[in-house]
């Protein structure tokens, strides 16, 4: 008898609405989904399907109207803001489509920036040497150590995304959330970023949840979930085993 896979991250009955001019706009309408430890999963859907809103809830950047978010066996959506921030800062790395690098800082300074912000001046001065060594190691991990003193204006889009990935790894997170990580890149550069994410997943055993509108990108994941109009349409497509030429095709299951 096979045991169920261990879930690192889970959404249970998640609902979320926003209000405009006294009109309620439902964005998520009851999402149940789990992400397996050590796997690379994809949430795929068109713009407006609710996938980015779900990612914000999974990252504790926002709270659901109802439902629960569980991380590594602990419910986190109902924690205090300070506690949610602590979870996110220590356990969850996040990258976005547009990198969000500070233009006046070098690559290594951008990687160090979150660690600087989270510490007092004295705390940063105390930990400065070890933090810099960690930042250098993360830039080396993404193949950009030789560009550590270049500013974003001196880097390509792919290089800037690599810096963003290095920054997300500074806290040695268990989970990486990637919101359209190749959406601002050409096809060839996007493929190199996907290859890097897969390498981090397989070699470093980093659990990754990737948000995308592109089926071809979603098909590189171990499991794919399709969202439409705030609902999860698909059963997970397990792409880890079997013939990928067949299994890598997303099946649309009627909601």
Swiss-Prot record:
UniProt xrefs under SUPFAM superfamilies: P-loop containing nucleoside triphosphate hydrolases
InterPro entries: AAA+_ATPase (IPR003593), ABC_transporter-like_ATP-bd (IPR003439), ABC_transporter-like_CS (IPR017871), ABC_transpr_LolD-like (IPR015854), MacB-like_ATP-bd (IPR017911), P-loop_NTPase (IPR027417)
UniProt keyword ATP-binding present: yes
Record-level Gene Ontology MF annotations: ATP binding; ATP hydrolysis activity; transmembrane transporter activity
This enzyme's EC code(s): 7.6.2.-
Class of enzymatic activity (EC top level): translocase
Its membrane topology: Peripheral membrane protein
Subunit and interaction comment: The complex is composed of two ATP-binding proteins (LolD) and two transmembrane proteins (LolC and LolE).
Protein name, UniProt field: Lipoprotein-releasing system ATP-binding protein LolD 2
Source organism of this protein record: Rhodopirellula baltica (strain DSM 10527 / NCIMB 13988 / SH1)
């Amino acid at each position: 008898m096979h045991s169920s896979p261990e879930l690192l991250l889970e959404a249970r009955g998640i609902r979320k609405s926003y209000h405009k001019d006294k009109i309620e706009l439902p964005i998520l309408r009851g999402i149940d989904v789990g992400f397996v430890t050590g796997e690379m999963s994809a949430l795929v859907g068109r713009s407006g399907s609710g996938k980015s809103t779900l990612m914000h809830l999974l990252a504790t950047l926002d709270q659901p109207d109802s439902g629960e978010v569980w991380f590594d066996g602990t419910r986190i959506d109902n924690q205090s803001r300070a506690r949610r921030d602590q979870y996110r800062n220590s356990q969850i790395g996040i990258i976005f489509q547009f990198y969000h690098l500070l233009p006046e800082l070098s690559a290594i300074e951008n990687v160090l920036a979150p660690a600087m912000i989270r510490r007092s001046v004295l705390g940063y001065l105390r930990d400065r040497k070890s933090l810099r060594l960690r930042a250098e190691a993360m830039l080396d991990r993404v193949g950009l150590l030789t560009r550590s003193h270049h500013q974003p204006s001196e880097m390509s889009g792919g290089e800037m995304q690599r810096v963003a990935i290095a920054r997300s790894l500074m806290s040695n997170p268990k989970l990486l959330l990637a919101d359209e990580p190749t959406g601002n890149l050409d096809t060839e550069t996007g493929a190199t970023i996907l290859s890097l994410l897969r390498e981090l997943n397989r070699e470093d055993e980093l659990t990754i949840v990737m948000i995308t509108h592109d089926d071809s990108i979603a098909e590189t994941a171990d499991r794919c979930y399709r969202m439409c109009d705030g609902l999860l349409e698909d059963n997970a497509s397990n792409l880890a085993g079997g013939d990928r030429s067949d299994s890598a095709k997303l099946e649309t299951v009627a909601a």
